[in-house]
Amino acid sequence: MQRRQQSGFTLIEIMVVVVILGILAALVVPQVMSRPDQAKVTVAKGDIKAIAAALDMYKLDNFAYPSTQQGLEALVKKPTGNPQPKNWNKDGYLKKLPVDPWGNPYQYLAPGTKGPFDLYSLGADGKEGGSDNDADIGNWDN
């Protein structure tokens, strides 16, 4: 009867691999953990572009943007007050109003200080101004 020779990894080899994986994890995890903030900013910019497109469609149908008082709600249900919508789309312009990635409502001002309307998120801190992740993200950034 012949004996087969089995080959495998020694305990030392396995420990070396575990140490290498630990070092890689220590280098990679901090890099990955900083990305959620960048992802939230990217989501906010995408939302702002989509809402701005809905506002442009509203203007095409009604010859004016909703007033600040009518707000973004005018994209979901027919607004009251002036300016009266002349040809409001019965299905609305958005199914529902999104909130920014930090859970706050998007801000809307018409006429805007930077264009026909200002549409923006207050950033991570939920307050006007700020820097880095707390900075406002607006349609003037796109």
Curated annotation (Swiss-Prot):
PROSITE patterns: PROKAR_NTER_METHYL. GO terms for cellular component: plasma membrane; type II protein secretion system complex. Residues 1-8 form a propeptide. Cleaved by the prepilin peptidase. Methylated by prepilin peptidase at the amino group of the N-terminal phenylalanine once the leader sequence is cleaved. Its main location: membrane. The chain crosses the membrane at residues 9-29. Keywords: Cell inner membrane, Cell membrane, Membrane, Methylation, Protein transport, Transmembrane, Transmembrane helix, Transport. Residues 121-142 are annotated as: Disordered. InterPro entries: Bac_GSPG_pilin (IPR000983), N_methyl_site (IPR012902), Pilin-like (IPR045584), T2SS_protein-GspG_C (IPR013545), T4P/T2SS_Core (IPR050470), Type2_sec_GspG (IPR010054). NCBIfam families: IV_pilin_GFxxxE, typeII_sec_gspG. This is Type II secretion system core protein G. It comes from Pseudomonas aeruginosa (strain ATCC 15692 / DSM 22644 / CIP 104116 / JCM 14847 / LMG 12228 / 1C / PRS 101 / PAO1).
